[in-house]
Amino acid sequence: MDKFWAHLIKVQPDPDPWVVAVSALAALVIVSFRMPWQVSRGLITIAHEGGHAVMALLTRRKLEGIRLHSDTSGVTLTRGRPTGPGMVLTALAGYLAPSLLGLGAAWLTEQGLITLLIWGVLLLLVCMLLLIRNLYGALILLVTGGAVFALVMYAPADVQQVVALVSAWFLLFGGVRPIVELQRKRSRRQARDSDADQLARLTVLPGGFYVFFFMLVALVSVAFGAYLMNPL
């Protein structure tokens, strides 16, 4: 156990500045272009629904399960009071989760705790798998978890570091684009049951305020994450 813990908190040396810069560029390309974004967007959905689930548990709502769909949408099913702080916080957590996870990943990467980061991601995926209530969602989590397990068990340290960097940047950039897509749908009246509109019905604030708040947190996370992983 002591050996495993020592392995878990082993600090890797700082990456070369060009590695950080290229990792950021790679993540930005994935998020910016349609085809790679369609392929990878499901990972952001995992983080989004995971955020709802964690907050539901923290606010003592009954978590009934999570569903992930092939169109990269998802839903987290909870039971409890239909109004009140618990419901508000649960609805609020989804769009914030990818950016905050990206910020946490950026901090761990900056600290050189790459192995701890990868094992942490694997643990979160396993916990989420236990809550999945549809076959497609289970398949996606098994594939993602299998890839993460293979990375931590078989990939050399420098490869793990690059993947961790790209993943941190991807979560940070990937936390922004769904908010843009959300507002675009809202402007066309195609997202009446979005998290922002649910929050508007739960509180006195309009849905546009929550879109603004989501975007503010996402952009601040990108800025602070970039500061932490500053290649210069």
Please report, for each region that a protein language model flagged, where it lies by residue.
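Membrane-interface loop-to-helix entry segments
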Residues: 15, 88-98, 136-139, 209-213
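C-terminal membrane-associated helical module and adjoining short loops/tails
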Residues: 139-232
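Structural signature of hydrophobic alpha-helical transmembrane segments
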Residues: 105-122
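Short, strongly hydrophobic alpha-helical membrane anchors
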Residues: 1-15, 232
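Small-residue-rich helix-interface/hinge motifs
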Residues: 33-87
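Divalent metal-coordination and catalytic microenvironments
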Residues: 48-50, 94, 199
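Hydrophobic, membrane-inserted alpha-helices
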Residues: 24-27, 100-104, 121-129, 143-151
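Membrane-helix interface "capping/anchor" motifs
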Residues: 36-37, 110-113, 129-141, 156-159
